[in-house]
Amino acid sequence: MKLKKSPIDVFDNWAKTGKDDGLEKNHASAVSKMVEYSTSALEKFSFIDAGCGNGWLVRNLSNDSRCIKAVGIDGSRRMIKKAKKLDGKNEYVCSDLLNWKPGEKVNLVISMEVFYYFENPEKLTHHIYQSWLTQNSRLIIGIDFYKENLISHSWPEDTGVSIMKLFSENEWKEFFINSNFTNVRSWRVDQRKDWEGTLIITGEKL
């Protein structure tokens, strides 16, 4: 049995080897749908990308004329170093998401393929509700690793990542509801044969 690595160690290595360059390509379709859903009715917004990787979403979305502030946070030192190298305009922070608090709260938090790398994702959901978001704000996340997406179940072994928590769509919604989010809903995008699609979960802080 091969020794498993922490998610941060794995993504540090991705940044080192250039494997992170595929993140935008692989996730752009689902993330664009999340962004459209989250921002279509907003005249302006400030946002945090939770688990920003090399900063591709922060770079792209900060160019939206309605975006007044964009912050990327990630636990991987190499990812943040790369993000800062590629983008001198926006703010990037290397920190544990569970411990970090922004200097200024935002009205949108987006996260793609991050939450299941935490031992207790509900704890992170609650922390974001309490410490990151203003009133009248939204958290929206996308995940590909969930119970209904059967093909993803082998990923912990395939990738050698030590923490990957597998939950159902309803369990993910419960995490949001238990963290006091309202108007919680979920749906799936980009489904195809043998692939249930990216699961999107969102809720509002009113």
Which residue stretches match the model-derived regions?
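Class I SAM-dependent methyltransferase SAM/SAH-binding core
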Residues: 48-50, 54-99
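A conserved beta-strand element that flanks and buttresses the S-adenosyl-L-methionine
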Residues: 110
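A short glycine-rich, Lys/Arg-flanked "PGG" loop and its adjoining helix->strand segment in the class I
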Residues: 122-136
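Conserved class I S-adenosyl-L-methionine
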Residues: 1-40, 147
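Conserved beta-strand signature within the Rossmann-like core of class I S-adenosyl-L-methionine
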Residues: 136-144
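Conserved S-adenosyl-L-methionine
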Residues: 181-192
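Short, glycine-/aromatic-enriched active-site segment of Class I SAM-dependent methyltransferases
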Residues: 144-163
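Short alpha-helix
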Residues: 164-180
